[in-house]
UniProtKB/Swiss-Prot annotation:
InterPro entries, A to Z: Fungi_Gprotein_alpha, Gprotein_alpha_su, GproteinA_insert, P-loop_NTPase
N-myristoyl glycine-type lipidated residues: 2
Stretches assigned to the G-alpha domain: 32-353
Name used for this protein in its record: Guanine nucleotide-binding protein alpha-1 subunit
Length: 353
């Protein structure tokens, strides 16, 4: 009698082989799938990086998608002017030209969320006239004393185009639009052989308790810091310096037991605003041990060292880049460098280098 395998045994062996093959496929896929967590304090530029990934790696925004940004851009623009006008009241700064006073009422009459495909002409005219006023400009220069959207000046400078009846948001308009991130958003894109799953979590303090759900099997952390905010206070706690908050947060992430083996890439972001601010808002006023005056390179080195020196693990390397998240050309270059870093890290973890 032969000792061939029974049908049941053959089926069992086939099942085992299929399971083994599936596990191999899963391991291969896992090696090629990069789970990247975007972290950083509120308004550090995380959502802007995600928009850049869509522009660079997903063919950009369709006409319908651009249309959907209109109301956000209109609302951002009107709300920014309202914030300045309210700050003028609290700082007791008058309009230079009282003839534009009626435009102030136009702005205050607008709802928080502007709806519609076209910005009402009287609103566009009001913003254009007020932005030219020397009193408004004077208040704008003191924007570190209140909470003003980073994109305010950009939208004000472009108000004639934004208020035009045939307006269609361009890439910069979309990149600079601001909606507070709540919860967790995921974006998937492919660079070379790697599939990236990038998670953006809300940066405000109230959102941070939700991060824990993203911690498992994270390949890389991309941590963003708005270095231009060295002289500003938190939106949610106006007793805390934004840069100090970012340092505290980076310390807790960099040295967390969850991330001992996770590579960390640090984007020191908003370098354009930082460069503009240094000559008019001395960094030494907020960081007394800083001795570099308004020298841009010295200030960059100081901030970089403040963050990197928080790393308590000798074997852990922090990869750093100075960035302007709204500059698509620069972000394309930086993300290519990030991709190279991740490939090297992957090879190291697999024991291939």
């Amino acid at each position: 009698m032969g000792c061939g395998m029974s049908t049941e045994e053959k089926e069992g062996k086939a099942r085992n082989e299929e399971i083994e093959n599936q596990l191999k496929r899963d391991r291969m896929q896992q090696r090629n799938e990069i789970k990247m967590l975007l972290l950083g304090a509120g308004e550090s530029g995380k959502s802007t990086i995600l928009k850049q990934m869509k522009l660079i790696h997903e063919g950009g925004y369709s006409r319908d998608e651009r249309e959907s940004f209109k109301e956000i851009i209109f609302s951002n623009t009107v709300q920014s002017m309202r914030v300045i006008l309210e700050a003028m009241e609290s700082l007791e700064l008058p309009l230079a030209d009282q003839r534009v006073e009626y435009h102030v009422q136009t702005i205050f009459m607008q709802p928080a969320q502007i709806e519609g495909d076209v910005l009402p002409p009287e609103v566009g005219n009001a913003i254009e006239a007020l932005w030219r006023d020397a009193g408004v400009q004077s208040c704008f220069k003191r924007s570190r004393e209140y909470q003003l959207n980073d994109s305010a000046r950009y939208y004000f400078d472009n108000i004639a185009r934004i208020a035009a009846p045939d307006y269609m948001p361009n890439d910069q308009d979309v990149l600079r639009s601001r909606v507070k991130t709540t919860g967790i958003t995921e974006t998937t894109f492919i660079i070379g052989d790697l599939t990236y799953r990038m998670f953006d979590v809300g940066g405000q303090r109230s959102e941070r308790k939700k991060w824990i759900h993203c911690f498992e099997n994270v390949t890389t952390i991309l941590f963003l810091v708005a270095i231009s905010e060295y002289d500003q206070l938190l939106f949610e706690d106006e007793t805390v310096n934004r840069m100090q908050e970012a340092l505290t947060l980076f310390d807790s992430i960099c040295n967390s037991r969850w991330f001992i083996k996770t590579s960390i890439i640090l984007f020191l972001n908003k370098i354009d605003r930082f460069k503009e601010k240094l000559p008019v808002s001395p960094m030494k006023n907020y960081f007394p041990d800083y001795e570099g005056g308004d020298d841009y390179a010295a200030a960059c080195d100081y901030i970089l060292n403040r963050f990197v020196s928080l790393n308590q693990h000798e074997t852990k390397q922090i990869y750093t880049h100075f960035t302007c998240a709204t500059d698509t050309t620069q972000i394309r270059f930086v993300m290519a460098a990030v991709n190279d870093i991740i490939i090297q890290e992957n090879l190291r973890l697999c024991g291939l280098i």
